[in-house]
Amino acid sequence: MTQAKTFKVTLVKSLIGRKENHIASARGLGLRKINHTVEVLDTPENRGMANKIYYMVKIEG
């Protein structure tokens, strides 16, 4: 059994005052508060959401 590829996303800037679709991308990744880190599957959909809000998150892996 192989493990699925994942990457970590950390919210480093506030969602207040951001575009609604950027807030939706952060929520879609499971990010809630500043410095909240989640591990998500490395899929094109998740990569796209993380890249869309690149200025608010730190991506590892």
Curated annotation (Swiss-Prot):
- Which GO CC terms are listed, alphabetically? cytosolic large ribosomal subunit
Any one Gene Ontology molecular-function term assigned to this protein's record: structural constituent of ribosome
Question: Could you tell me which CDD domains the record lists for this protein?
Answer: Ribosomal_L30
Q: Does the keyword Magnesium apply?
A: no
Keyword annotations from UniProtKB, A to Z? Ribonucleoprotein, Ribosomal protein
Q: Among the record's GO biological process terms, what is one? A: translation
Would the keyword Plastid turn up in this protein's UniProt record?
no
Q: Which domain of life is it from?
A: Bacteria
**Family that this chain belongs to:** Belongs to the universal ribosomal protein uL30 family.
Q: How does it assemble?
A: Part of the 50S ribosomal subunit.
Q: What is this protein called?
A: Large ribosomal subunit protein uL30
- Gene that specifies this protein: rpmD
